[in-house]
């Protein structure tokens, strides 16, 4: 199985804008940002509010610039979270971002408009961080992080289930990229 590439920008570009990874190209990094047609522009034209959440700095990979140039109305990042909740260079823990997102999504739902929201986690990226309040079964860092990521998703779904917008929401869970092993090229040659 293949993902959109081996970098976060490949996942955002491929998943939300339907473009494949291009060898040695970082499409989100350009100073002059071209307009791409993707799910955000299509849904925004049809009356949807468009949001993107990340646990960390929205300037990483120029995510905020790219998303806003391509019909994302609001990007929520570490600049929005209470500073005491930022635990690593990757910002807040995933479960905190999920909890933080629910009242914001409620505000958008209260406006009577449908919305699309992408919530990008970072718990499976180094430096690995598992909050003290979560006790994984595994002693292995990689497995503990997987357990924590699963827990974080369950926190979000339990909170979302209580909201009025839950019954009309399609939840799609995807990876922004595959696990990086030994890579000679940015993409597998068989791709």
Language-model regions, residue ranges each:
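Solvent-exposed soluble domains appended to multi-pass membrane proteins
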Residues: 1-191
């Amino acid at each position: 199985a293949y993902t959109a590439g081996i970098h976060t920008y490949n996942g955002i570009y491929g998943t939300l804008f339907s473009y494949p990874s291009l060898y040695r190209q970082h499409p989100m990094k350009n100073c002059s940002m071209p307009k791409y047609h993707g799910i955000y522009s299509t849904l925004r034209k049809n009356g949807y509010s468009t949001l993107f959440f990340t646990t960390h700095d929205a300037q990483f990979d120029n995510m905020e610039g790219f998303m806003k140039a391509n019909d994302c109305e609001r990007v929520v990042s570490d600049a929005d979270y209470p500073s005491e909740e930022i635990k690593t260079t990757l910002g807040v823990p995933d479960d905190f971002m999920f909890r933080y997102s629910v009242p914001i999504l409620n505000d958008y739902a209260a406006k009577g408009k449908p919305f699309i929201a992408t919530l990008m986690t970072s718990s499976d990226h180094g430096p690995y961080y598992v909050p003290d309040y979560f006790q994984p079964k595994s002693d292995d860092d990689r497995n503990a992080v997987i357990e924590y990521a699963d827990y974080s998703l369950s926190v979000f779904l339990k909170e979302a289930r209580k909201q009025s917008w839950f019954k009309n929401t399609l939840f799609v869970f995807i990876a922004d990229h595959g696990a990086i092993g030994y890579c000679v090229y940015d993409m597998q040659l068989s791709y």
